[in-house]
C-alpha cells in the first residue's frame, strides 16, 4: 500500500502523519503462548504504518481536485463532482447511463463505457443494480473504536489480543497515543459503551496489563456494526466494484485498505494496457482478467480474517489448546511467521506496476 501511494506521488503529503509499525504482537488471554513478528526479522524497515483515515481521504480529494484543475504533471482529462450521489444506473446498447446529483441538487447524466463503483459498504451503485451479497461470516458483531493517551512509549508495536470478551487491536499513533478497536458481540459492545471513561480504561488495563504503562484518557468511543460479505458479481463487462463495495471484511488484521489499493492498482494495469492497444473498456476480457487476478486473493484474505475471528474466540478447550500451541509453533517456526507477515503487509497475489514502484506508463518486466 505504501509503495502504491509513493508511486502515485501521494506519500510526501501523508508521511508526516504516518506512524510506523515495527512489530506485531499476537496473543490469546489466559494462554502462555504468543507470537511476535518484527520488521527486523522480515528484513524490512517497517511492517506497515498507521495514517488517520480522515487525513488520507482529504489528501486523495486534494489530489483529484488538483488533477481536475490541471495543476499536476499528469496529462489527464478529469471532471470532478464532489460530493455526488448516484441516483440511477442502467445499461444501454452502447454504454451505461448514469444519473447522479451534486450537492447543489444539479442532475447530471453521463454515458461511460466503464463504471468503477468504489462507494463503500452501502454502495448505491451495487444496490441499484441489484447485485446480491454473499455473507462470509456467521458472527453478529460490532466494533468500538477510540484513541487512547498512554503514559509510556508504544515502541511502534501493534497488538492483537484475543479474549473471551472479544478481539482487541491496538495500533501505534503519533505522540504517545494508540488507536484501539474492540470487536465483540453486540451485547458486549453495548455494555462497554455504557461504561464511564475510568471504568472503560480500567477494563482495558486488565486485558493489556501495563504494556503501555497507565492508560490515561480516551476519546469518546464510536460504535460500528460489523459485516463481512463479498458481492456475488464484482465485475462484469463495463462494470467493476472496488473496495468495500465489492468486499467488506471484519477488522481483524487491518486488510481492508490493503485489499482495496491492490484491487485498484491491478485494475489500473488492465485499463492502461487496454488503452495502449485500443481495446474497448467494456470488452469482456478485461473484467474477466480482473476477476482471475483478484478473486483468489479476496477469498484467501476473507477466509483468513474470518478464521481468526471465529477460531480464536472459541471457548471449546481442545480448540484453545490447539490455538495456544499454534501461536507457539508460529513463534518458533520462521516460514509460518513469514507467511503471516506477508498477509499482514499485503505482499501476496499478483504484483501490479504500482505495487512494484512503476508508473502505468512504464513497461512491465
What is each of the regions a protein language model found here?
Residues 1-21:
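Glycine-rich FAD cofactor-binding loop and adjacent beta-loop-alpha segment at the N-terminus
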Residues 2, 23, 53-57, 61, ...:
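A general structural signal for well-ordered alpha-helical segments in protein cores
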Residues 5, 60, 170:
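Residue-level signal for inorganic ion chemistry
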Residues 14-128, 137-141:
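Conserved N-terminal helical subregion
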Residues 91, 154, 260:
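Pyridoxal 5′-phosphate
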Residues 101-109, 114-221:
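Conserved FAD-binding catalytic core of PHBH/FMO-like flavoproteins
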Residues 190-282:
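FAD/FMN-dependent oxidoreductases across multiple families
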Residues 269-365:
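C-terminal helical "tail/cap" subdomain of flavin- and related membrane-associated enzymes
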Amino acid at each position: 500500500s505504501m509503495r502504491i501511494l509513493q508511486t502515485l506521488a501521494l506519500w510526501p503529503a501523508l508521511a508526516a502523519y504516518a506512524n510506523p509499525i515495527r512489530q506485531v504482537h499476537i496473543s490469546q488471554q489466559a494462554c502462555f503462548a504468543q507470537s511476535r513478528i518484527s520488521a527486523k526479522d522480515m528484513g524490512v524497515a517497517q511492517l506497515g504504518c498507521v495514517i488517520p483515515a480522515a487525513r488520507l481521504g482529504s489528501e486523495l480529494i486534494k489530489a483529484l481536485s488538483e488533477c481536475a484543475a490541471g495543476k499536476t504533471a499528469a496529462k489527464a482529462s478529469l471532471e470532478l463532482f464532489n460530493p455526488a450521489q448516484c441516483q440511477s444506473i442502467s445499461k444501454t446498447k452502447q454504454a451505461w447511463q448514469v444519473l447522479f446529483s451534486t450537492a447543489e441538487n444539479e442532475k447530471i447524466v453521463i454515458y461511460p463505457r466503464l463504471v468503477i463503483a468504489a462507494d463503500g459498504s452501502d454502495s448505491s451503485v451495487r444496490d441499484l443494480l441489484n447485485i446480491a451479497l454473499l455473507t462470509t461470516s456467521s458472527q453478529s458483531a460490532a466494533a468500538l473504536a477510540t484513541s487512547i493517551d498512554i503514559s509510556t512509549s508504544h515502541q511502534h508495536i501493534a497488538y492483537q489480543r484475543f479474549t473471551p470478551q472479544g478481539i482487541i487491536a491496538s495500533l501505534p499513533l503519533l505522540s504517545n497515543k494508540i488507536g484501539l478497536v474492540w470487536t465483540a458481540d453486540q451485547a458486549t459492545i453495548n455494555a462497554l459503551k455504557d461504561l464511564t471513561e475510568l471504568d472503560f480504561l480500567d477494563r482495558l488495563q486488565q486485558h493489556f496489563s501495563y504494556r503501555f504503562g497507565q492508560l490515561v484518557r480516551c476519546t469518546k468511543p464510536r460504535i460500528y456494526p460489523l459485516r463481512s460479505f463479498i458481492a456475488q458479481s464484482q465485475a462484469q463487462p463495463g462494470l467493476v466494484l472496488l473496495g468495500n463495495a465489492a468486499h467488506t471484511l471484519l477488522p481483524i488484521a487491518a486488510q481492508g485498505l490493503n485489499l482495496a489499493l491492490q484491487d485498484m492498482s491491478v485494475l489500473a494495469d488492465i485499463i492502461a494496457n487496454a488503452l495502449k492497444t485500443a481495446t474497448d473498456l467494456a470488452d469482456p476480457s478485461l473484467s474477466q482478467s480482473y476477476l482471475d487476478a483478484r478473486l483468489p486473493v479476496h477469498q484467501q484474505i476473507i477466509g483468513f480474517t474470518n478464521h481468526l475471528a471465529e477460531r480464536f474466540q472459541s471457548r471449546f478447550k481442545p480448540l484453545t489448546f490447539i490455538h495456544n500451541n499454534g501461536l507457539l509453533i508460529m513463534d518458533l517456526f520462521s516460514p509460518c511467521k513469514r507467511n503471516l507477515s506477508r498477509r499482514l503487509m499485503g505482499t501476496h497475489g499478483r504484483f501490479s506496476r504500482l505495487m512494484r514502484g512503476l508508473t502505468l506508463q512504464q513497461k512491465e518486466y
